[in-house]
Swiss-Prot record:
UniProtKB keywords: Amino-acid biosynthesis, Aminotransferase, Cytoplasm, Pyridoxal phosphate, Pyridoxine biosynthesis, Serine biosynthesis, Transferase
Binding-site residues, L-glutamate: 41
Protein name (Swiss-Prot/TrEMBL): Phosphoserine aminotransferase
Localization per Swiss-Prot or TrEMBL: Cytoplasm
Pfam family, any one: Aminotran_5
Family membership noted in the UniProt record: Belongs to the class-V pyridoxal-phosphate-dependent aminotransferase family. SerC subfamily.
Subunit structure: Homodimer.
Positions contributing to pyridoxal 5'-phosphate binding: 75-76, 100, 148, 167, 190, 233-234
Organism: Campylobacter jejuni (strain RM1221)
Keyword check for Cytoplasm: yes
Cofactor(s) listed: pyridoxal 5'-phosphate
Taxonomic lineage: Bacteria, Pseudomonadati, Campylobacterota, Epsilonproteobacteria, Campylobacterales
Pathway(s): Amino-acid biosynthesis; L-serine biosynthesis; L-serine from 3-phospho-D-glycerate: step 2/3; Cofactor biosynthesis; pyridoxine 5'-phosphate biosynthesis; pyridoxine 5'-phosphate from D-erythrose 4-phosphate: step 3/5
Name of the gene this protein is made from: serC
Length: 358
């Protein structure tokens, strides 16, 4: 019997995708070989590669103004690639909303970029999204869409005249996005859209001009990968294969509007369980900034019960509920592949646990 997996990433995958990958693992589409065994230069793999890029653009409703890049190194490599490629000679502005923005700021500073932190919620342990106003003439403005550790999320992105950079690693493909002022939108796919080893970057083509005539190593230059259709070197072929299966699954769900609707229902159910617990459970994030993806909470009346909660949840068939080591507590990551019944099972367990130990 499969466990209900609330892991923050890598995370649970739709069962039908796992079953399809299992079916095709040794014999891809009846060809007599695995997709893992063939060259990335073959027509067979190129159909997967380019098909995945087109379907990703289709889900977000993007036209040819954007390039889709498949890269390696995780989203963390983008912390350096972004300033390397997109910083000019001005100020690069960052909103600091958690661990991942702090790391991005640090990487930009290492590169000698003129970094300005224009807003931060660190003083309140990142329990909210701070109000931010980016200047009009910065080289770029940078935000992290969703914060896996602290359970906060931008409900709407800031409207800026300067190019907006969005780290969407933990709410990738979970909702429709207004790209009108987004210059680069990226994430590792292992939470909501596949397995680890692949990063997907949507970059507006005019931004590629910034990489020209810069002394950047080829592998770290966006232009290199755009000009070579993300085939400059051997790509993570199996991760891209899993990614196209995820794109097909999302399209079959009805697209991102339908996916967002389901995600909202799941989150509402879980937050209601916390809010109606008479203070037994307490969420970390301010209500107005609560994440639809990651629900971080404590057993407020007795935090010593939290390890027992995780243990008994595992015994009941639910894994991945231990909070991040930085914040502690309990965290339920309810990404796209988790369904409403699975979240309902967690809520029922929470009520039973409260009944035993309140």
């Amino acid at each position: 019997m499969r466990k209900i997996n609330f892991s923050a990433g890598p995370s649970t995958l739709p069962l039908e995708i796992l079953e399809q990958a299992q079916k095709e693992l040794c014999d891809y589409q009846g060809r007599g070989y695995s997709i893992m065994e063939i060259s990335h230069r073959t027509k067979v793999f190129e159909e997967v590669h380019f098909g995945a890029q087109e379907k990703a653009k289709k889900l977000y409703g993007l036209n040819d103004d954007y390039e889709v890049l498949f890269l390696q190194g995780g989203a963390s490599l983008q912390f350096a690639m972004i300033p390397m490629n997109l910083a000019l000679n001005g100020i690069c502005e960052y909103a600091n909303t958690g661990v991942w923005t702090k790391k991005a700021i640090k990487e930009a500073q290492i590169l000698g970029v003129n970094v300005k932190t224009v807003a931060s919620s660190e003083e309140s342990n990142f329990n909210h999204i701070p109000r931010v106003e980016f200047r009009d003439n910065a080289d770029y403005a940078y935000i992290c869409s969703n914060n896996t550790i602290y359970g906060t999320q931008y409900q709407n992105y800031p409207k800026t005249k300067t190019p907006l950079i969005v780290d969407a690693s933990s709410d990738f493909f979970s909702r429709k996005v207004d790209f009108s002022n987004i210059a680069l939108f990226y994430g590792g796919v292992q939470k909501n859209a596949g397995i680890s080893g692949l990063s997907c970057i949507f970059i507006r083509k005019d931004m590629l001009e910034r990489s020209k005539n810069k002394q950047i190593p080829s592998m770290l230059n966006y232009l290199t990968h755009a000009e070579n259709q993300s085939l400059f070197n051997t790509p993570p072929t199996f991760a891209i294969y899993m990614f196209i299966l995820e794109m097909d699954w999302l399209l079959n769900q009805g697209g991102l509007d339908k996916v967002h609707e389901k995600n909202s229902q799941k989150a509402a159910m879980l937050y209601e369980c916390i809010d109606l617990s008479n203070g037994f459970y307490k969420g970390h994030a301010d209500k107005k900034d609560r994440s639809l993806m990651n629900v971080s909470f404590n057993i407020a009346k007795n935090k010593d019960l939290e390890p027992l909660f995780v243990k008994e949840a595992e015994e009941a068939g639910m894994i991945g509920l231990k909070g991040h080591r930085i914040l502690g507590g309990i965290r339920a990551s309810i990404y796209n592949a988790l369904n409403l019944d699975q979240v309902k099972t967690l809520c029922e367990f929470m009520k039973e646990f409260q009944g035993k130990y309140a």
